From Swiss-Prot:
Binding annotation for Mn(2+) 2: D13, S63, D462, H463
Protein name according to UniProt: 2,3-bisphosphoglycerate-independent phosphoglycerate mutase
Cofactor info, note text: Binds 2 manganese ions per subunit.
Recorded catalytic activity of this chain's protein: (2R)-2-phosphoglycerate = (2R)-3-phosphoglycerate
Entries under SUPFAM superfamilies matching the protein: 2,3-Bisphosphoglycerate-independent phosphoglycerate mutase, substrate-binding domain, Alkaline phosphatase-like
GO biological process: glucose catabolic process; glycolytic process
Pathway: Carbohydrate degradation; glycolysis; pyruvate from D-glyceraldehyde 3-phosphate: step 3/5
Function, in words: Catalyzes the interconversion of 2-phosphoglycerate and 3-phosphoglycerate.
Length: 531
């Protein structure tokens, strides 16, 4: 089977719509070609947050749920909503894996480590879930509880960890001082996802061996000291508590990792559990330090096959007949292309939690989705992406144009990470450069794919970010938004419906463009108006 006109889904990660403002990097970047597209082709504004992507009302969207819904064609109740319900009903305290972990700790007279992003951002975690498990552990009679906290500052305002942890200390006091903050780490270190093992190494030391790492005697003073040297929550240097000198992770201890989103939990969790993981073949780690086979590790959700612990509190229920899977079954040839930072998003997440591409790391002969191929472009090795706001967008486009010229693919999924990843640095000017870079790359792609190869581009985003770099209080905004996002379709022969569009309608719309029947699993309709 071969489609009449190939379709390219271009996902501009973090590209939202907002009113003109000095903090609107999208608007201020003067994206001339995007404006040309809007004047030339049908386009609309679509929902990408809250209930429209399976999240609680008014919850900002994120890359994971955005990509899931772009490929799903239906609303999928997301992890945050599920765990909020489990917490509210106290079912989390009855979860089989969590209860077995409590039993394990009591039997071994060992420590329970609660580890995760301690934040109310709701993108990777929510501290309500960790606190619920903490209270459940106390009710179960556990008294040796260690908090290994990861601080946010990216999906929240930059400096909220002080207040969050102050409240946690008060909660510990209210519970007869059961529990201690054993270590702290900014997410820059503990939640790296791009194999920067030098960062993971420091976080690992704070949790596991206490070697060559900072320490503190007063956690609040330590955070204040970090703030004074312009380290916001994301950048807090890992440290351990001197009052818990022997509280490092040991044999027979248990960890419950409370992050529910996989991508930034995979690397540190794999290091903690899997001796065959690439980090242990890397000079950053030595075999003698590995204790993963002597602990019980529980993740809230499935992270990756590289996390070898079998203990998952809420096992996945992958979606079926997502766009990629459906096209594969029809014998259509497809390509996924992104840089390292976002490769899991155009594979694992876009495929509804099905790991056909090994989280984007499979070689083409290892992919378990028929007729599917991948191009992985390395991300720049810089400390923060405002140092290179172009990221790897030019290299992605160069490779993509090579692939387009082959005239082989019926469907291509492309992710440009710039608006999101540079937006997260809080650097407004750099984010404007990031947006302008994408404008230039879209022009190159349009010339080759649409004008020379008669393809159709569907240009959209997974969530907003770069359009609000300064919040209403005048503070730097690094987090995602609840903004609407554009959907532009480069087909002059169609009209689009304007009735509350949402990004989950992108998949059925692409099938409609291909003149392919929409499967029953896709509960939403196409946005194309055939009247």
């Amino acid at each position: 089977m071969k489609v009449k006109r190939p379709v390219l889904l271009a996902i501009l990660d973090g590209w939202g719509i907002s009113e003109p403002d000095k903090g609107n990097a999208v608007d201020n970047a003067n994206m001339v070609f995007v404006e040309y597209l809007k004047k030339t082709y049908p386009w609309l504004k679509a929902h990408a947050s809250g209930k429209w992507v399976g999240l609680p009302e008014n919850q900002m969207g994120n890359s994971e749920v955005g990509h899931i819904h772009l490929g799903a064609g239906r609303i999928n109740l997301e992890s945050l909503a599920k765990l909020n319900h489990e917490t509210k009903t106290n079912n989390i305290a009855k979860n089989d894996e969590i209860v077995k972990t409590f039993e394990y700790v009591k039997k071994n007279n060992s420590a329970l480590h609660l580890m995760g992003l301690f934040s109310n951002g709701g993108v990777h975690s929510h501290f309500d879930h960790m606190i619920a498990i903490y209270k459940a552990a106390i009710d179960y009679g556990i008294t040796n509880i260690k908090f290994d906290l990861i601080t946010d500052g990216r999906d929240t305002k930059p400096k909220l960890a002080y207040d969050f942890i102050k409240d946690l200390l008060e909660l510990i006091k209210q519970n007869n001082n059961i529990g201690i903050i054993s270590s702290i780490s900014g997410r820059y270190y503990a939640m790296d996802r791009d194999k920067r093992f030098d960062r993971s190494r420091i976080a690992y030391n704070a949790i596991v061996n206490r070697n060559n790492v900072r320490s503190f005697t007063n956690i609040l003073d330590y955070i204040q000291q970090e703030y004074m040297i312009n380290h916001d929550d994301e950048m807090i240097i890992p440290a351990f508590n001197q009052d818990d000198l022997n509280g490092n992770l040991k044999a027979n201890d248990a960890i419950i990792m409370t992050n529910f989103r996989p991508d930034r939990a995979i690397q540190i969790s794999s290091i903690l559990t899997n001796k065959n993981y690439i980090a242990w073949q890397n000079e950053a780690f030595s075999d003698a330090e590995f204790i993963g086979d002597k602990i019980r590790f529980v993740s809230m959700m499935k992270y990756s096959d590289s996390v070898t612990s079998p203990h998952i509190a809420y096992p996945p229920k992958p979606l079926t007949n997502t766009l990629g899977q459906y096209l594969s079954q029809l014998g259509l040839k497809q390509l996924r292309i992104a840089e390292t930072e976002k490769i899991a998003h155009v594979t694992f997440f876009f495929d509804g939690g099905n790991d056909y591409f090994k989280n984007g790391l499979a070689k083409n002969d290892e992919i378990t989705l028929a007729n599917a191929y991948i191009d992985l472009i390395p991300s720049a090795k810089v400390a923060t992406y405002d140092l290179k706001p172009q990221m790897s967008a030019v290299e992605i486009t160069d490779k993509l144009l090579e692939e387009i010229k082959k005239d082989e693919f019926d469907f291509i999924v492309l992710n440009f990470a710039n608006c999101d990843m540079v937006g997260h640095t809080g650097n407004n000017k750099a984010t404007e450069i990031a947006c302008k870079t994408l404008d230039e790359q879209l022009k190159r792609i349009h010339e080759e794919f649409v004008l020379r190869h008669n393809g159709i581009m569907v240009i959209t985003a997974d969530h907003g970010n770069a359009e609000i770099m300064i919040d209403k209080d005048g503070q730097v905004n690094k987090k995602h938004t609840t903004s609407l996002v554009p959907i532009i379709i480069t087909d002059l022969n169609i009209k689009l419906k304007q009735n509350d569009p949402e990004i989950a309608k992108v998949a059925p719309t692409i099938l409609d463009l291909m003149n392919i029947e929409i499967p029953k699993e896709m509960e939403l309709e196409s946005m194309i108006d055939h009247n």
